[in-house]
C-alpha cells in the first residue's frame, strides 16, 4: 500500500488586500438613541421570559434572562465605545477641555504619517480611536472610570445622578461600582 504524504503545506499569508471601512462617528443624540433602543429590546424580552416561565418552560425563560445580561453588557460596551469616539473627537476639535490622559495617548509613527498627510481631515483620528479601543471591553467599573477620566467626565456627578437616594447609606460611587462589577 502506498504511503500518504501528511506533511503540512506552507500557507500563503497577507495575499489579499485589507478590507477598509470608513469609521462612523455618531452624534450624542444618536448614541443615546441606539442605547435606548437596545434597552427597549432587552426589556421587551422580559415579557417573553415571564410567559415562558408561567407556561412551565423555566429553562427557556432563564436562558432569555442570561441572554439579556449579555445584550445589556453589549449595549453598555457599544455606548462607551461611541461616547469615547465622540468625546475624543470633541477634545481633538477643541470643543471639550483636554485631559492628562488625552495628552498621553500613545500614537505610533504610522498613524502620525497618515495624520500629516490628511491635513484638516479627521478621518485618520477616528480610525486611530477605533483601532486603539476596538479590543478593549468597556463594561467594568474600572474601564468605565478610565474612559470618563480620559474624556473629562466627572464620575461622582454621574453616580450621584444615577444612584442618589435620600437618606441612603451607600455612597453613590460605590453603588455605581457594585452595579458594573
Ranges and model annotations:
Residues 1-70, 82, 87, 94-95, ...:
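Charged alpha-helical initiation segments
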Amino acid at each position: 500500500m502506498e504511503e500518504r504524504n501528511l506533511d503540512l503545506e506552507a500557507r500563503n499569508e497577507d495575499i489579499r488586500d485589507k478590507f477598509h471601512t470608513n469609521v462612523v462617528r455618531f452624534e450624542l443624540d444618536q448614541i443615546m438613541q441606539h442605547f435606548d433602543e437596545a434597552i427597549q429590546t432587552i426589556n421587551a424580552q422580559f415579557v417573553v421570559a415571564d410567559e415562558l416561565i408561567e407556561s412551565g418552560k423555566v429553562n427557556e425563560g432563564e436562558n432569555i434572562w442570561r441572554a439579556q445580561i449579555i445584550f445589556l453588557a453589549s449595549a453598555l460596551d457599544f455606548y462607551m465605545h461611541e461616547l469615547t469616539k465622540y468625546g475624543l473627537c470633541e477634545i481633538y476639535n477643541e470643543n471639550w477641555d483636554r485631559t492628562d490622559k488625552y495628552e498621553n495617548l500613545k500614537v505610533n509613527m504610522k498613524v502620525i504619517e497618515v495624520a500629516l498627510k490628511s491635513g484638516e481631515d479627521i478621518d485618520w483620528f477616528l480610525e486611530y480611536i477605533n483601532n486603539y479601543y476596538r479590543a478593549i471591553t468597556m463594561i467594568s467599573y474600572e474601564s468605565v472610570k478610565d474612559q470618563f477620566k480620559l474624556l473629562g467626565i466627572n464620575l461622582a456627578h454621574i453616580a450621584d445622578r444615577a444612584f442618589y437616594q435620600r437618606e441612603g447609606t451607600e455612597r453613590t460611587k460605590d453603588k455605581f461600582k457594585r452595579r458594573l462589577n
